[in-house]
């Protein structure tokens, strides 16, 4: 009962601190969800990590120069440090034999080390305003105040302006780089724009989840979204949804248990969505396994169905019941697979069992004719239109017969007419 009371109170927005943290993290998640799609498509995931670690010295310098923990100075310093980091990565990789991933590692390590040194200097400086500056390492969403919301809101508005304005440019540059060169699209500008969005979103977001976890907030929702779709627009919407839901979940868990840090719980929530997507999305591992299992069973039942029909075709008695031994003698199939295939045919209503005998139903005969018809039509098509020798067409037809749709079969018949025999002079069965 307390849970429901807490839930109602949480979403009643009566507590100013909860409201600030909730809306701040939602706006941050919204922004990072969009930027993350651009990052993943542009294969700049490692750059995000480099930028997030490199921002620390910029924040420290911003504090040293201003003497106060003002978001304007800290974020400005962080953005400048992020720009330097991106430039250093490009400069090192272009002017030396060092590859880009190594250049990223070098930049990340050096900049972060400098940041830690500056942070240590600040902590021993005696400046009372430095309290809480170390929270940028691991994040502390509870420190979000109303002024921070203005910063988050400005950033969200900036992203919402840039994405529609350059939507087609992003789409062409990310999905078809060669075409973008052909039409004269300034890819360097687009790359710079993406880098700019990475730097700004990272500089603003580290207060919430910290330098260590910031890259996860940008990369994870987008990576999860691509398990569900490859469409650019849909991936942005799904990524934003995942980031927003995770932000709400992280703040709510932190509200229920004040000892629980908000930022890490946002990332844990995102990771849970990512794991679920990796297994249960249309392209997930579990879903693929289910589809593969279904395809294997279909191919097995189709092959057993063909064999049953072909025995009858050979003897001109397709409705006659057959023993398992007869089926095995016609074409050897491991006994366990044959029994499984026959059970599948029975379940589908394509065959019936009478004692120890198996017989095709009318539906089974019709389906067997369709499979064999596709097989033999495809063999003829390959020989006639693709100029492939008749002794080289069987393997391809063995695959096509299981996957060709009725629409494609109709197109094939329209193209070829209604031929009587295949390349091996076997009769092509049609419905009566």
What residues fall within each predicted segment?
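Membrane-interfacial amphipathic/re-entrant helices at transmembrane-helix boundaries
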Residues: 1-30
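Short loop segments and helix-boundary regions at transmembrane helix junctions
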Residues: 38-52, 56-126, 225-239, 253-260
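Structured cytosolic domains appended to multi-pass membrane proteins
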Residues: 317-432
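Short amphipathic alpha-helical interface segments
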Residues: 293-333
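Transmembrane helix-bundle core of multi-pass membrane transporters
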Residues: 107-162
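Hydrophobic alpha-helical transmembrane segments
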Residues: 22-27, 75-80, 105-106, 149-154, ...
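Membrane-interfacial segments at transmembrane helix termini in multi-pass membrane proteins
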Residues: 262-310, 406-414, 418-429
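Membrane-helix/interface signature in polytopic inner-membrane proteins
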Residues: 161-194
């Amino acid at each position: 009962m307390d849970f429901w009371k807490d839930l109602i109170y949480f979403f009643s927005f009566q507590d100013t601190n909860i409201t600030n943290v909730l809306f701040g993290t939602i706006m941050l998640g919204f922004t990072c969800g969009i930027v993350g799609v651009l990052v993943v498509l542009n294969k700049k995931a490692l750059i995000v990590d480099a930028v997030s670690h490199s921002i620390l010295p910029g924040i420290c310098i911003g504090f040293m120069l201003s003497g106060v923990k003002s978001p304007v100075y800290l974020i400005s310093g962080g953005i400048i440090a992020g720009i330097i980091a991106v430039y250093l990565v490009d400069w090192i990789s272009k002017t030396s034999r060092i590859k880009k991933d190594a250049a990223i590692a070098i930049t990340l390590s050096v900049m972060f080390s400098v940041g830690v040194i500056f942070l240590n200097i600040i902590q021993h400086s005696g400046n009372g305003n430095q309290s809480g500056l170390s929270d940028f390492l691991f994040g502390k969403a509870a420190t979000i105040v109303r002024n921070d919301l203005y910063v988050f809101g400005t950033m969200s508005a900036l992203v919402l302006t840039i994405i529609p304005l350059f939507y087609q440019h992003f789409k062409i540059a990310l999905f078809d780089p060669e075409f973008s060169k052909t039409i004269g699209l300034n890819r360097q500008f687009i790359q710079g724009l993406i880098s700019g969005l990475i730097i700004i979103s990272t500089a603003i977001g580290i207060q919430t989840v910290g330098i260590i976890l910031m890259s996860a907030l940008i990369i994870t929702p987008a990576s999860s979204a691509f398990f569900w779709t490859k469409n650019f627009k849909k991936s942005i919407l799904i990524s934003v949804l995942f980031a927003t839901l995770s932000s709400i979940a992280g703040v709510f868990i932190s509200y229920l248990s004040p000892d629980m840090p908000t930022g890490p719980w946002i990332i844990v929530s995102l990771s849970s969505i990512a794991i679920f997507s990796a297994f249960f999305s249309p392209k997930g591992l579990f879903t693929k396994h289910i589809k593969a299992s279904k395809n294997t069973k279909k191919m097995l039942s189709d092959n057993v169905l063909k064999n049953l029909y072909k025995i009858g075709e050979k003897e001109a008695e397709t409705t006659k019941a057959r023993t398992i031994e007869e089926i095995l003698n016609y074409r050897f199939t491991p006994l366990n697979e044959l029994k499984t295939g026959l059970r599948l045919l029975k379940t589908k209503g394509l065959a019936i069992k009478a004692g120890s005998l198996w017989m095709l139903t009318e539906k089974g005969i019709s389906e067997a004719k369709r499979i064999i018809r596709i097989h033999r039509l495809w063999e003829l098509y390959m020989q006639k239109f693709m100029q492939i020798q008749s002794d080289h067409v069987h393997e391809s037809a063995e695959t096509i017969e299981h996957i060709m749709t009725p629409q494609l079969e109709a197109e094939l018949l329209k193209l070829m007419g209604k031929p009587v025999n295949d390349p091996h002079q076997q009769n092509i069965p049609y419905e009566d």
